Amino acid sequence: MNSIVKPKNLLLALVVTAMGLGAWQSASAAVAQDTLMIGKPADPQTLDPAVTIDNNDWTVTYPAYQRLVTYKVENGKGSTEVQGELASTWTTSADGLTWEFKLKPGNKFDDGSEVNAEAVKFSFDRVMKLKQGPSGAFPEDMTVSVVDPMTVRFVLTAPYAPFLSTLAHNGAAIVNPAAARHAEGAEAYLSTHTAGSGAFKLTNWQKGQTLTMEQNSYYAGPKPTLQKVVIKIIGEASVRRLQLEHGDLDIVEDMPEDQLAALSKKSGVVIGDFPSLRVTLLYLNTQKGPMSNPDARRAVIESLDYNGIITGILGGKAKPLNGPIPQGMWAYDEKLEPMKQDLAKAKADLAKVSPKLSNLSFMYSDKDPNWEPIGLTLQAGLQSLGVNLKMEKLANASMRERLGKGDFDVAIGSWSPDFADPYMFMNFFFDSRLKGLAGNRSMYENPAVDKLIRESATTLDMGKRVELYQQAQKIVLADSVYAYLYQKAYTVPMSDKVKGYVFNPMLEQVFNVGTITK
């Protein structure tokens, strides 16, 4: 791949290299062994567990909160099976509609108040009332009641196959009800603060610079070795790399292939590649603008050089997708063909579009350094067909706001599951009740698909669920709802001083800071 270095980036790198290395070397000596330094390209958008569906936010929220259940760690590896965290035991009725959870005594929020059944009810009622993305993981008619101070009951109106697993995801965080008593209200307060019972709490956030987390002195679990976690916001990947090399950072995220190649040659740096269910795809706005025409969507999908993206931009470190459900997730359909470029078909589909398609916009952010070259690849393919693609780069928070409103033609994003069920890829992507940032980012609506995916979610027979999801996949592929680009391993470079990191494919960008040591 030919690397393009922007003048301002080159200048910054030269200035950093010339002036900053000595400062970083001296700074690294001052970084305490009990402090973990993480480098990210962008601030969180919100820290409210009832609102965020962005793994970038979860680096802060996941360790700050606890949930009724959590993912097991087996032989040092993350598992998709769950075990009790705040819950000691649970029971379910024979029909799968009633679930009761007994809480462990002694858990406290970071202000010292008790974690009890009222707090659990408050948290889930709030999620369902706000109706943001996290609520899509739960049945919309679910009710939560307090049986006694340490017992909580969930009642569903229909069986819900992934229910127990959903209780481990970020949106199931148990929030201190005291958050509602802050003058600005719970929504405003929780967007920039934490109020949980996890091992760490947020103590400072200087936007665009750092987020600082310190131990929660009331945490009832094993005392962490780390005293502090500092997240540094550093937009330039080259600067994140240099700071990792020189000891000012312990972990860095979202690194392009050229920076990973440079890091691979440095002693003291370990690059972890973990099998992942994360997918990258193009959102095609099916509700308005030029992408509301299915022939126009097909032309965009057919114009893209998928192989060039994987081999050129990603250095071969990804595999093609053949539909919504990635390899490694049950209900994956190996009989489907991966997407591929076909300019002749694209030209024929464009000829069917009226009025003629001449201009499109491509919305992306600085969250992932690969997104811009992917956009340029799409631009080249469309240009050969007489379509002009305008590149529109936004701050990540601004882009997500636009996605939520459906204010775009074509946009790019990545998605990884929060629990081990195809629901994450089928119901979130296509259910008409979840349009926008919640998951259905192509704003798609098809009653036949709604029926299939909703039936699958309420069916306990796994074979039947596979059949229903695979039927739905064929329909949405024919409707050209998304362009499925690739499935890529989760790559995280870190200092070899960091010990005990546990990767879980349900928790990308979440670091087990309660058990990591240096």
Per-region residue spans from a language model:
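Long beta-strand-rich cores associated with HINT superfamily self-processing modules
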Residues: 492-518
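Ligand-site clamp/hinge motif
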Residues: 216-262, 388
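Append "and occasionally in soluble cytosolic enzymes with long acidic Gly/Pro-rich linkers
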Residues: 215-217, 265, 292-380, 384-385, ...
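Gly/Pro-rich hinge or "lid" segments in bacterial periplasmic/extracellular proteins
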Residues: 69-77, 168-224, 228, 344, ...
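N-terminal lobe/hinge region of extracytoplasmic solute-binding protein
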Residues: 40-94, 125, 195-196
